[in-house]
Amino acid sequence: MFHRLTLTAAALALSVSAAHAAQDTITLGMVLEPPNLDPTAGAAAAIDEVVYANIFEGLTRFGPDGAVLPALAQSWDVSEDGKIYTFHLRTGVTFHDGTTFDAEDVKFTLDRARAEDSANAQKALFAGIDTVEVIDPATVTVTLKDADGNFPFNMAWGDAVIVAPESVADEATNPVGTGPFKFDEWAQGDHITISRYDGYWGTPAQLSKATFRIISDPTAAFAAMMAGDVDAFPNFPAPETLAQFSTDPRFKVIVGSTEGETILAMNNRQPPLDNVKVREAIAHAINRQDIIDGAMFGYGTPIGTHFAPHNPDYVDLTGLSAYDPEKSKALLAEAGVSDLTLRLALPPPTYARRGGEIIAAELAAVGIKTEITNVEWAQWL
């Protein structure tokens, strides 16, 4: 059993008012710096925040309502048994280095993603592929081991974007895709810049340039917005300051739901966490609402599954691990565990560092000591 405590984080975004809408460049604030820029060889969400749908594209893409739409594949056919997908590719598409996109690139990408030594973070998306066959430069056939109606959906993920063999070796630091923006520069620790690709096959980008500024410190993020150094800040890291922005006519504050989750994961291979009673005791020792209030200033929702509350399939299971410190103590006693010290590793985001302190205090209240270790994102992954 792998036990988790989960919260959904509220999506917080700040932007300047419509008075600046006429500009054709934008500077975005970004909390976490990507460890690399190859979405097919890294798990960090920060990678896709920069490159997905900007630099790279897949065979399919997600529409605003979640529908699967054509992208580099203009259409596809499915065999009657649901096992063979034939993708009809767009022609006249080029990568940013001038290389022509064709069916060989699709085969290379899918074979690379499902290879035994693949570094793809979502390798399971490609596990059902049996063969990939190039029919002609504009047609590729993917045969699955079993029928899978989700396959076009899987191909819209950031982990399934199409890369070229000519440039793949340098994707981590010099990404080359087919999207509406091309990579310009990465000043590590400071910013990443992309610019409009004039040879784009689809509707040209309205912006000529976009800069992602790395600002991990909440105080610095607040100051950058107030000074006008950034135009917008998705995933804003200082929720305690939102009231100030809300009353300032220069800014627009958007608070929405998200698929993002805050998870406390436990290593259930390591004693005494291999004992389900100990894991349950930890779950009952923690008040998730305290984390939401203390770390995110009320922005968030306790959940008991990996579905967000806005998902139509969501079932509220928070009661299975409700906050109950007395029950937590009883479970520890039943497990015969006392004088327990756990190591709590926390990644860089503010919610994690703040939330970790709250968790440590609540575990201490039931007799569990914690040693907090702050780690960088690359170590965490």
Identify the residue ranges that each predicted region occupies:
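Ligand-site clamp/hinge motif
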Residues: 169, 197-243, 360-361, 369-371
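Aromatic- and charge-enriched surface segment that lines or borders ligand/interaction sites
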Residues: 74-119, 135, 141, 272
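N-terminal lobe/hinge region of extracytoplasmic solute-binding protein
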Residues: 29-80, 111, 176-178
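Ligand/substrate-recognition segments at binding pockets and active sites
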Residues: 28, 188, 312, 329-381
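Gly/Pro-rich hinge or "lid" segments in bacterial periplasmic/extracellular proteins
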Residues: 67, 147, 153-205, 209, ...
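Structural transition elements
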Residues: 267, 297, 301-334, 351-354
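Alpha-helical secondary-structure segments
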Residues: 27, 102-109, 137-143, 179-180, ...
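Surface-exposed binding/hinge segments that line
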Residues: 88, 122-165
